[in-house]
From Swiss-Prot:
Protein source organism: Spodoptera frugiperda
Protein name: Large ribosomal subunit protein uL6
Gene designation: RpL9
Keyword Metal-binding: no
Entry similarity comment: Belongs to the universal ribosomal protein uL6 family.
Taxonomy, superkingdom: Eukaryota
GO CC terms, sorted: cytosolic large ribosomal subunit
Pfam families: Ribosomal_L6 (PF00347)
Keyword annotations from UniProtKB, A to Z: Ribonucleoprotein, Ribosomal protein
InterPro entries documented for this protein: Ribosomal_uL6-like, Ribosomal_uL6-like_a/b-dom_sf, Ribosomal_uL6_a/b-dom, Ribosomal_uL6_CS2
Keyword Ribonucleoprotein belongs to the record: yes
Gene Ontology biological process terms from the UniProt entry: cytoplasmic translation
GO-annotated molecular function: rRNA binding; structural constituent of ribosome
Length: 190
């Protein structure tokens, strides 16, 4: 039997404003503004009241109905981003040649030097709105921060992929920069 309608609601916390205009969702919060375009999905996105966003799909296939929850998850990540922010921690792993990481251009570009003893300098540019710094507390650790989860995670992925070992047995040569922790910038007090 075909499902007639699938709908989900997202509760919006106090202190945030969410605008929806033709499937373009804008979330404003204390850490900034995030916009996301959902025009590629044929779903209804509307504000029921200033504190509730409703996403629904009528007479959809299984895949189209699944997109309803996906949109809600993206909006929840945007809400989390403008309230708490996202933070990824990366550690450099090396057996012999110590990897040297230097941030330049206002913490938006990272230069990776001495990877496997190579002279080549790897430069990785962060996504807009993402900063990278060397951790003051922990040796060989990078901290990547930003409001957009997609931008922070893709920047971390670019750093990790820039230090892939070529033409060697990757089980033996484990050198590189790897994500060690995923958290928010502002941590909840327990």
């Amino acid at each position: 039997m075909k499902q007639i309608v699938a709908n989900q609601k997202v509760k919006i916390p106090e202190g945030l404003t969410v605008h929806v205009k033709s499937r373009l969702v804008t979330v404003k919060g204390p850490r900034g503004v995030l916009k996301r375009n959902f025009k590629h999905l044929a779903v209804d996105i509307r504000m029921v009241n200033p504190r509730v966003l409703k996403v629904e799909k009528w007479f959809g296939s299984k895949k189209e109905l699944a997109a309803v929850r996906t949109v809600c998850s993206h909006v929840e990540n945007m809400i989390k981003g403008v309230t708490k922010g996202f933070q990824y921690k990366m550690r450099s792993v090396y057996a012999h040649f110590p990897i040297n990481c230097v941030t330049t251009e206002g913490n938006s570009v990272i230069e990776i030097r001495n990877f496997l003893g190579e002279k080549y300098i790897r430069r990785v540019k962060m996504a807009p709105g993402v900063t990278v710094v060397n951790s003051p507390k922990q040796k060989d650790e990078l901290i990547i921060e930003g409001n957009s989860l997609e931008d922070v995670s893709s920047s971390a992925a670019l750093i990790q992929q820039s230090t892939t070992v070529k033409n060697k047995d990757i089980r033996k040569f484990l050198d590189g920069l790897y994500v060690s922790e995923k958290t928010t910038v502002e941590v909840d007090e327990i």
